[in-house]
């Protein structure tokens, strides 16, 4: 996922998970083949700010596709009940009970990232789901690999590889920004854990809580404010908030930079999917 600092009239500051490019490139798709843009549109993705990167394309700020993987995306159902509820993708993790192995391969700050990863694992495992998590020491063992790459400045923190595959495997890797100064020895462990837990949520099938109206958590209307189906499905999870806002959800599109452990609706959603 992509996260940025945004300011509006110097009144607020938030960090955005996904879907917002640097101003200079947010509307430029000149380098993207028209065939790719047409396929994105046909499968429900926004073409705002599509970015050509090594080996493929970054779409909606948080999804990476090669041309081949894009062609395999199937259009899923889009069931919207309200504006701020928990939603899942069409594909979920299968073969339960299952242990998802996570490796921290971030190139620096090993103690910080190991501690944050362990906190993420503890958060999920505390719920007693049939989907559990375990940290492993090598990428070869891992189902989800956390890596570092220079994603530029401007407050960009990271990007995930999307959502579960058609055969029920989690998306990998989660890429966090390794540009100098993005993360430091003084970075709060629990805040970093919230960032990683959010990305892990996507890899196991969680959409943004406010995917249909990101203005709710971001405070301003962004390009592609309603993320739509995005070719992966946006299915309401029964039992979660269907009539009022859910300000503390770990899957909101924007965060204020504080720790967000699972709130009651988050727990309901995860239990519905994986208990």
Label for each model-derived stretch:
Residues 113, 145-173:
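Catalytic zinc-binding patch centered on the HExxH motif and its immediate surroundings
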Residues 190, 195-265:
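The catalytic-center signature of Zn2+-dependent metalloproteases
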Residues 177-197:
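Short pre-active-site segment immediately N-terminal to the catalytic Zn-binding motif
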